[in-house]
A protein has these predicted regions:
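Acidic, contiguous internal or C-terminal segments within carbohydrate-active enzymes
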Residues: 134-181, 187-188
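Hydrophobic residues positioned within well-ordered beta-strands of beta-sheet architectures
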Residues: 40, 128-130, 148-150, 161, ...
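N-terminal amphipathic/basic-hydrophobic helices that include classical n-h-c signal peptides
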Residues: 1-37
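Beta-strand-rich N-terminal accessory domains
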Residues: 23, 27-100, 104-107, 250-259
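Active-site/ligand-binding surface loops and adjacent short beta/alpha elements
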Residues: 182-185, 189-259
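Short solvent-exposed loop/turn micro-motifs enriched in small/polar/acidic residues
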Residues: 32-35, 89-91, 111-116, 143-147, ...
């Protein structure tokens, strides 16, 4: 129903100190399809962050002391994105379609917000907000009025990613929203990811489902348990052979890439 939902993700880049004044700017560039794009910059003495207006997508987080990049550089040979926001669907629908109000609608994986130009609404020294509004084209795929707001706030060695979904209509707004950040790993120039892993705060074991690579649909009958050592699971040669690890429920509130 009419109203709004607010969510926040916190990315922390550790072992960084001596933070002072933040400032913001922007520059214009042409993408690989010769499309005119805007990239906005948030910067302090420690981090430099870049966000595209297209998809309001986080594209770069660099440690300024040594120009170390934390984010995946969107090599299209493997995966041509860096950190798309998934809206109004997370994942795939069966046959890439769904029914609502007696009608069938076609929609691609992860919705459409990541593939649309967002409007920069406000910008301060340390914070920037973008917005995306429903229009005639989105209504063809998703028959709901909405306002999606995506914000980024730079504070010390942390980048806060904020979402706000507003419903300007009186009918219930059905949606899902998700993050899809990709981080550089290995981080220090190693030849493999062995020795790196994930830490799930407060957990002794992790329960997850898998999915089918050809459709992306979850295999809900599959319940896999990963034992954790000191809250961690380390990457093995076959760790990423599985398409996706689907972790349901509020098992933890913090996941870290560790080495």
């Amino acid at each position: 129903r009419s109203g709004s939902v607010f969510s926040l993700i916190l990315l922390t880049f550790r072992n960084i100190h001596n933070v002072k004044l933040s400032f913001a700017n922007a520059y214009r560039y042409l993408d690989d399809k010769e499309k005119d794009c805007m990239r906005y910059v948030l910067e302090n003495d420690t981090l430099r962050v870049e966000i595209d207006s297209f998809g309001a997508e986080l594209k770069s987080v660099k440690r300024k002391s040594d120009d170390k990049e934390y984010m995946w550089y969107a090599d299209k040979k493997y995966w041509g994105r860096t950190s798309p926001v998934l809206f109004p669907f997370v994942g795939n629908c069966r046959n890439k379609e769904y029914r609502y109000g007696g009608k069938t609608y076609a929609i691609g994986q992860h919705g459409f917000a990541r593939d649309m130009e967002h409007t920069m609404e406000s910008q301060t020294e340390d914070t920037i907000w973008f917005s995306l509004h429903s229009d005639e084209e989105t209504m063809k795929k998703y028959p709901f009025a909405f306002v999606l707001k995506i914000g980024y706030k730079l504070a010390d060695n942390e980048l806060k990613v904020m979402w706000k979904v507003e419903n300007p209509d009186t009918k219930t707004l059905y949606f899902s929203i998700g993050a899809h950040p990709a981080f550089l790993c290995p981080f220090n120039g190693e030849e493999s990811k062995l020795g790196y892993g994930l830490q799930f705060a407060g957990l002794k074991e992790l329960h997850h489902h898998g999915n089918t690579p050809d459709t992306g649909l979850a295999v809900m009958s599959e319940d896999i348990v990963i034992p954790l050592e000191d809250e961690k699971v380390y990457f093995t040669p076959g760790f990423f052979d599985r398409c996706t690890y689907m972790v349901e429920g509020k098992q933890t509130g913090e996941v870290s890439l560790v080495t």
